[in-house]
């Protein structure tokens, strides 16, 4: 009876192999993380030296194993990978603290990305292995290679050489590993293994796409289809020499090498002759072009035939059945255009080059763009020209991440030989080529940079008008100003009651005898229409001095006119936008260059004469917008108390309570400082001591004190800013026709109580270390001598004192008493609360309000009575 022999089929656990490699890699990572910069640098230097020592042996192995390329050129590649790469990365800080900016309080700390999967091509097997191993270990990352199967032995030999050197120098045993039995399955499992942190991929489109599909932060690069444009201004001999150098280097296997030359018609024949003079063969007949195309490209014409990649021009010509001299270095296919109908205009990775005539510069650029679109987006483009403007235009138009000028593409693209680009054997193609990077990959791409940011206080400031004049008769300063054309902005009352004439008389005593133009149509709560109306007069008159005379409305309107006069392209839409930091605002108002701006207040309230603020009502939506920019700060403020002696009692009360609100809000602002708090406190003290008397008797002392308090409070809030009392007042005052100061008086007690409660949303400002509005209010109460044993009691004492002061000055302290109906309030309150939140003053409030909380404050003030 015959015995049947059953053949044993050997099975191999691919997944188990990958698991083992990954686990060893993770252990190696722990070891590498313990090494310092000096140790890492020593290890990588030893790797470089070891690879350099064996560069010839590895080159020979690569050529013998793959059958592709040129031994001598591969030796140069290996030297480049070990010498140039080491030189480029040797001083890179990749361990621990790599950068510290003590002024900014920023410390950058480098950490390894983790275990890397390195995929290498058959075209540059040993040099790419050396390169990737060195940049991986330089950044303390273990690397596990998946080599191209056709270059497994030479690639593994390169890895073994640098591994042995690394381990001998102190690196962990498994810091460099590789798949010993290569397969598509093994590469896929390695790239997708959970321990693998990133994929460093060099190869064909399919492999790179697989790397990006892993869901890991892959560093893969795309294919090239490099156009080289030789213009009529080019140095022909140099350009042709560069092309020979590039296309014959390792038989054209560097992906950055030129795939077609586009030549201006004027020098087309000269270029051909230069090529022919140096053993190029021009393929121009239809029959030879067809043969070459059949040999070089796959049948569908969409990709190069792998069988010719890296072979000599003579070998490829023989395959194509084209007789060429034995010394032929380069095959040049003369074709008519770029596109699918011209397969030889695609990437060829061999000493085969397409040549296309351009009848104009525009056509030349178009053909280069078409080359990239056909299959080289993001990679490399070359121009040979002495026209520097054209070099820049080429760079702007080409969708390539390496734009090389008067340079051989193969040697230029990898960097640091013909230019100062980062040396690399992995060339990023950016979003054009569906890559995550657009530069040459190096060690900098293989670290996680942790940023340690120390808390800092923003630099603060104290900005005021350069000149502030005060005391009675300080208006006489106008007699000495340098002026030829003075624009006076005021309201009708200033003309009616003689204040405008007072200014005019001072100017008439000025030896410069300035011309004077008056705009006196400013209304309460000035609108953009008023500003634009005044601007027309400004533009016609062209003043070199602007004087704002009156209350806040006149000064604010004048600021708006001044702003637009100085810079007509200023946008009110931009100027009204809210900001978190005045120094970083998205819209910047430019400083004045034409006219000096002088403010002379005739009421004691707004402080606008010393502030960078102007409140303007948009004529389109009837909303008050506080404009804020230090470009709006006046050049001169004249605080002359004689101008406020006849202000009516009701106006004095309203403006005085506005002063109090300025002072209290600036004191508790998140931006309050030692420079502003003293001014705030003194202004508060003056208001409580003199406002009631100023309203009821109008005596000179109290009026002067209140005038000074107004400016002092203005100085404080010009630098510390305000809070939500003003945010709400800006919106409800305009909507309900209530004077601004009176609106603040009604709101302030409720805002104090609200701000003093523990916040639901904390304010954001670095210098504001913790919530302290309650204690700030309590400090004010103590300063005023108010009663209270606890912080809460002192806060309530302050709120009550504010309310009582309002009553004492004749203000009815609720909305209802101002003629507002509940129905009207309910109909508008939601919109007004939102607008108040949007107001610029909200950002400096000691706690961030919710819109619902602003609404509650408004509601509470409707019929409130103490």
Where would I find each of the regions flagged by the language model?
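ATP/NTP phosphate-donor binding region
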Residues: 459-545, 816
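Gly/Pro-rich interdomain helix-loop hinge
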Residues: 735-824, 864
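Glycine/threonine-rich beta-strand-loop-alpha-helix active-site module
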Residues: 93, 158, 529-642
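ALDH superfamily catalytic-core signature
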Residues: 5, 12, 130, 208-332, ...
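N-terminal Rossmann-like NAD(P)+-binding subdomain of aldehyde/semialdehyde dehydrogenases
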Residues: 2-107, 135
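Conserved C-terminal structural/oligomerization subdomain of aldehyde/semialdehyde dehydrogenase
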Residues: 322-458
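Rossmann-like NAD(P) dinucleotide-binding subdomain of oxidoreductase/dehydrogenase enzymes
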Residues: 97-238
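Carboxylate- and glycine-rich phosphate/diphosphate-binding segment that chelates Mg2+/Mn2+
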Residues: 277, 610-720
